[in-house]
């Protein structure tokens, strides 16, 4: 990993763009940090870092104010990364089905999501290796947002992640429900009740499948982009509980 640019934002947060091989990413660290700080991995939809930047930097600033470093990486096939023909075809099939008012088949969902999970999760793990080697970044580590299936796989295979905040707003292959049953870390799940592109019952079934002793579902009225401001405050409180180590207190257990 090497840094390609850096700037101090107006609130003092240090923003550094980096490259991990062909994978672009961004790291944000608090201005006031005098010791290694906990890290939150910021998931994002496959729309590209540049398009998602305003939302990502807002999340990063909010987290920095709570004493967390945050980082994100460009997903495979997104942004400036090479196109991925199979996934592009699946996206076209998805748009065609939704425009026609037809149910989205399991085959389309599998073709859209499963290859992304298989490729993105090892990339996230490689990024985590590199980020935790930096003197200013320490543990514990949390994961927040993005494609929920990527978060599920990461929570299953990556022991350094001790807590996760998921957004139940994307299609989930049936195979991921089995993986969800293996998750035991604390979870904070956000659901937009009127999300036009999300199967509400499937989201509730997925929440039920999580095997975590501590899991909370935060449902708000409104569509996919209508997440209220206070929802971010609740997620911040969740990570403060589980990533800020206090004397005599353990971080979230993996079971």
Regions found by a protein language model. Name each.
Residues 174-175, 196-202:
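Conserved alpha/beta-hydrolase "acid-adjacent" motif
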Residues 1-38:
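N-terminal cap/lid segment of alpha/beta-hydrolase-fold proteins
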Residues 221-222, 227-255:
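Catalytic active-site module of serine/aspartate enzymes centered on a nucleophile-bearing elbow/loop
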Residues 203-204, 208-226:
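Catalytic histidine neighborhood in serine/cysteine hydrolases
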């Amino acid at each position: 990993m090497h840094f390609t640019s850096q700037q101090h934002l107006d609130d003092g947060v240090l923003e550094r763009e980096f490259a991990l091989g062909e994978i672009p990413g961004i790291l944000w660290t608090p201005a006031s940090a005098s010791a290694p700080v906990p890290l939150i991995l910021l998931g994002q939809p496959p729309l590209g870092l540049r398009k998602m930047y305003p939302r990502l930097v807002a999340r990063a600033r909010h987290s920095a104010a709570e004493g967390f470093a945050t980082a994100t990486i460009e997903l495979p096939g997104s942004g400036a990364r090479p196109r991925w023909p199979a996934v592009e075809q699946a996206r076209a099939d998805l748009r065609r089905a939704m425009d026609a008012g037809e149910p989205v088949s399991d085959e389309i969902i599998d073709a859209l999501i499963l290859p992304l999970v298989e490729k993105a999760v090892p990339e996230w793990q490689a990024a985590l290796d590199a980020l935790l080697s930096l003197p200013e970044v320490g543990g514990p580590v949390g994961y927040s947002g993005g494609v929920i299936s990527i978060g599920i796989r990461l929570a299953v295979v990556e022991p350094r992640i001790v807590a996760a905040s998921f957004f139940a707003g994307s299609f989930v292959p049936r195979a991921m429900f089995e993986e969800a049953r293996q998750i035991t870390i604390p979870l904070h799940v956000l659901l937009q009740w009127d999300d036009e592109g999300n199967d509400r019952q499937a989201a509730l079934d997925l929440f039920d499948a999580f095997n975590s002793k501590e899991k909370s579902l935060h449902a708000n009225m409104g569509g996919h982009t209508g997440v209220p401001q206070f929802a971010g405050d609740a997620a911040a409180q969740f990570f403060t509980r589980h990533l800020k180590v206090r004397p005599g207190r353990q971080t979230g257990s993996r079971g």
